[in-house]
Design a protein with these regions (language model features):
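Compositionally biased terminal segments of proteins
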Residues: 1-185
Length: 185
């Protein structure tokens, strides 16, 4: 609560002036007992008061939550996750938004493209030797994303200042996450 106006005031922490601070904060939690996820869902919007609607939090099912927690790192007592965890989350959000759009729901195409672009950028941070095991369903979601990425001829890594082709990025992600795909080991 703002001490002068008496109104609630919320802040998004993005693009800090001091480079020692993270670029963005996301909150992750697993579903509490009182919230029932729709069958087959793993990302679920939570109805909130309009005052906090601009804040970012992601409710995860147990499988995704365990995946995040298994890769959690810590710096100065603050837990965080890196590209190895964010890539499957962004890919899953992309799959979810595309599915919802295909069903006729109003989905902003910019959000779909943002998740794809985020995965492309984050994939550049994966060290060549890194291998990240995935639960079967998370692997299936990531494979669906990679299929969609391959099929989308409008995706241009060069517009993101990346020197790889879509095919190279798909191969690198599949290799890192040990996914079974045509043309990979």
């Amino acid at each position: 609560m703002h001490w002068i106006s008496g109104r609630c005031q919320f802040y998004r922490f993005q693009k800090p002036v001091d480079e020692r601070f993270p670029v963005m904060l996301e909150l992750f939690c697993r579903a509490p007992d009182g919230i029932k996820l729709a069958e087959g869902s793993h990302l679920t919007p939570i109805p909130l008061d309009e005052a906090v609607a601009s804040l970012s939090a992601i409710l995860l099912d147990d499988e995704y939550y365990a995946f995040i927690m298994a890769g959690r790192r810590e710096s100065d007592g603050l837990p965080w996750v890196g590209e190895d965890r964010l890539i499957p989350l962004k890919a899953s959000a992309w799959v979810d938004l595309n599915t919802r759009q295909a069903k006729g729901e109003a989905v902003d195409a910019k959000n779909i493209r943002k998740h794809a672009n985020d995965v492309l950028r984050l994939s550049q941070l994966l060290a060549p030797e890194v291998r990240i095991p995935l639960a079967a369903r998370i692997g299936d979601d990531l494979n669906r994303f990679l299929d969609g990425l391959t099929a989308d001829r409008s995706i241009d890594p060069k517009s993101l200042k990346l020197n790889n082709t879509v095919a190279e990025i798909v191969r690198r992600i599949a290799q890192a996450y040990e996914l079974k795909r045509a043309g990979t080991q």
